[in-house]
Amino acid sequence: MTRNLQGLDRRAFLKTSAAGAAGLWVGFHLHEPLEALAAGETGTAPVALNAWVHVGTDDLVTIFIDKSEMGQSILTGLAMIAAEELDCNWKKVRTEFAPADKAYVNPWFGVQGTGASSATRTSWDPLRKAGAAARMMLLEAAAQKWGVDKSECRAESGTVLHAATGRRASYGSLAQAAAKLPIPSDVPLKDPKQYRIVGKPTKRLDTPLKVNGSAQYGIDVRQPGMLYAIVARCPVFGGKVASFDAAKAKATPGVKHVIQISNGVAIVADNTWTAMEGRHALEVKWDEGPNVSASSGSISKLFAERAAKPGYVARKEGDAEAALGHAAKKIEAVYEVPFLAHATMEPQNCTAHVRADRCDVWAPTQAQTSAQATAAEAAGLKPEAVFIHTTFLGGGFGRRFEADFVREAVEISKAIGSPVKVTWSREDDLQHDYYRPASYARFAAGLDADGWPVAWINRIACPSIMARFGPLKDNFDSRSVEICDSIPYDIPNILVDYQVADPGIPVGFWRSVGASQNGFFLESFIDEVATAGKKDPYELRRRLLAKSPRHLAVLETAAQKAGWGAPLPTGHFRGIATVTSYFGFVAQVVEISVDRGKRELKVLRVVCALDCGRAVNPSSLEAQVQSSVVYGLTAALRSAITIDRGRVQQTNFNDYPVLRIHEMPAVDVHIMPSQLPPTGAGEFTVPPVAPALCNAIFAATGRRVRRLPIRAEDLA
């Protein structure tokens, strides 16, 4: 079970959550020892807490989750971590979304947010300590009740047992007594050999809610007296309203308001369809601004010009230019990828209710405190007066780290004095995104007389994601060269540099961020190096990764499981790629069939070996890898955002297609055993998909794919 909390104030948070179920509360700070305790109505609200465990007198255990659930099963995974150390009955566990508060700030981002495969990694230690603290307090409560030493008691599946006397007590019966005890400053954590929850394939806690329809997504929110809004936005990036005539829109039956907001003109109506009809009737003249001449062609030209010049040096080992000059053989290549939209299944939406002293926001957000700050600014209130109610997310992929849809809803609600839901159409969503940056990469490599690489030069030009958040030091954005600046291959001379190229198209975080395009660049070109040196692509990688044991292990596992080197059926071909990013290691082998006469490609199988530390829930991890394959194949085979006259040309899934069910290959997932802390898997398993696929196409056709998405001529 999962529900939302309706407030920010910690004391109110506790009272609301514990209504009718007094018991043991344990909270803890991310960076400090365990601290503070709240016991229902009678306890004191803890300060700067990061997450919570509540053991109710009814034996229910509630884990409060400060992360966003967008399909990755984080509700279940984080609950498993706390429940393991608590030693509770898993069937008695439920979860609740925590409110927005600085106490929950993700140390990676500086905001409360979910992304970069950080949710499990940053919660692993705090949640284990919270669960263990609650367990120790329950043991102490039982020991005091029975007049025995705590060391004689043990916890098991929601019960404390005293073996010598056979006495037993449920957690619920001990909760109130435990709540009166101090939180221990140091708690013993389980030996992983004792784990009975973590590491076991576990069904998702939110599946029943999604099956019966009770899971609330942002698009499902309803509030008393709520109106519905659609926003007309300038089709050209950077444009704004010059003037508008609202007469025809206001004449549409059911339209209540037509108002200008910072991002365009809002039509407010009795329902979303009527608001859309009102937008169709609205007459707007746009000031199209400075980007009206931008096109995909001009952007590509800009990138090529920038990449031809030296830029900020992101990595330098040895003297790559001199080594290239003395190499026995030289190869060069240029790679290019387009802008990409996020295309979340649930389009952007937000419901807001602004009053004189309070603002409530219901949003499918990945960044609660950013949404809170944006809403506070738009409402003219302090952040403490803004209450963020996080819903389930119908996909995130980084898009919902933005707060543009929150600002719109708050501005409209403030203007009309009523709660309002803003809904984006699919066309709005595709044409007003913060896109994965288009990128351009030049490569040069030098080989010795035996065909091994001795020089590697990589120049990248693309927009900066981080530039809109503040000035770039030395005009450098590390996300733009992500993984290219940390190339794992043992090559003695390496030079990687970067040039910012800003064509005026808004860019943002997209699943795996810079690694998404740079994985394609790097792993495609290393395949070219193997071919030029007359090496097997797998064997070349093996030798160059000899000093990187975790990376080498996933490479060897993927190759072995895929049968690398074994004969394939006629017309079948393989490609391989391996990437490390977001603290994870992954290798993939893609098997395809190609009909060169018809220029048709079928992806048959993807074999994936990954090392992400300890696997908390292997079944969810496998699902994450499968979804990464879908996302990676969609980007490689189908997707491109193209620009003409400063406008996005794509409108819906008819011209921005995604992978269909019948196109989905078999995906074999092999999780490497590990005793290391978990990292997460939502990001790093995306980047190898495209290069492994394109390397398989080269094996089939002898043609290199250096530009995505793949075209029919690449299969000839």
Predicted feature locations:
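Cofactor-binding beta-sheet edge motifs in enzyme active sites
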Residues: T2-L30, L37-A716
